[in-house]
Amino acid sequence: MSCSEKRGGGYKGELKERNHHVLEGEEDEEEEEKTSSVTQPNSSLTAPQLTIDGNLLVDPKLLFIGSKIGEGAHGKVYQGRYGDRIVAIKVLHRGSTTEERASLENRFIREVNMMSRVKHENLVKFFGACKDPLMVIVTELLPGMSLRKYLVGIRPNQLDLRVALNFSIDIARAMECLHANGIIHRDLKPDNLLLTANQKSVKLADFGLAREESVTEMMTAETGTYRWMAPELYSTVTLRQGEKKHYNNKVDVYSFGIVLWELLTNRMPFEGMSNLQAAYAAAFKQERPSLPEDISPDLAFIIQSCWVEDPNMRPSFSQIIRMLNAFLFTLPPPSPSVLESDTNEPAATSNGTITEFSARARGKFAFLRQLFTAKRTKNSQ
């Protein structure tokens, strides 16, 4: 678990009053980016009662909220302090009806339980949570910014290819960890990816839409962001309230393909389209963002494998990591100035070493391509 200290207590009156005031703010300005949330009728009566392990609860008396640093459809994020730690504090909305409150509370408990059981260097660290009088999640505060903000800030320039690949490997490793623990994120996009202080690594945040994979792989269609969502998440027909839908963890692989394309091009997916137009183009016309003419065939293959229509044809994140690393080793060595500024990246000391790595990488990459090509051929017969 990310947090093993046992904590408890109640909010100070001043903090409680302030937090309640916080929740009365304006609605999410990016709601247009989202699909409608589906709440099952009588969910509070039919859903099993979820609980949070007492070891995961923070002591509210040690929790102080500062300035707002982010906002989403389900809550707001603040910079704050927990004891002597500078932290990020996510305050979630309670809901206005009994059914909505029950649904949001279950979502909150699931998010807390999932965050507490996965630990990885590319996942935002979870410190704890409290449920009353407000639903709060406490995590590490990254001094960097979201990947979305960073990419917008450097436009019209693009990321250095090595930087883009290292970011993508960070993301793939985080997703590999989630999938290994039976968790589907369902909302992988640059807004939920945060840069570290030195802007050399990326961490995945926001488990608000994450779900545990069930044996039947039947889940309720919920909120997500169209431009990065796998088509099977919003299907060819609108789901009626409470209907179930089949999908698996390969929805995250599709989203990763879009994010990888974005890292390489620094453009908005489905540029020039509205959100609904983007959804229609992806689901009904099988359209995908245009690949650059000068993109490496190997990188094009990785991206196209991720966003292929048939989820079963998409690679796993373990395979994606192998392919990205293999391609990374085929690149020429970085310039001396890059090596001096990046102490995290090992420098090769001889051309022979680089050549040896490149040869191995090309062989491994060729094998993976043959594997996926054979799988596609077999599937189409």
Enumerate the language-model features and the residues they cover.
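Activation segment signature within eukaryotic-like protein kinase domains
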Residues: 167-168
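Glycine-rich ATP phosphate-binding loop
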Residues: 78-96
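Regulatory alphaC helix of protein kinase catalytic domains
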Residues: 108, 112-113
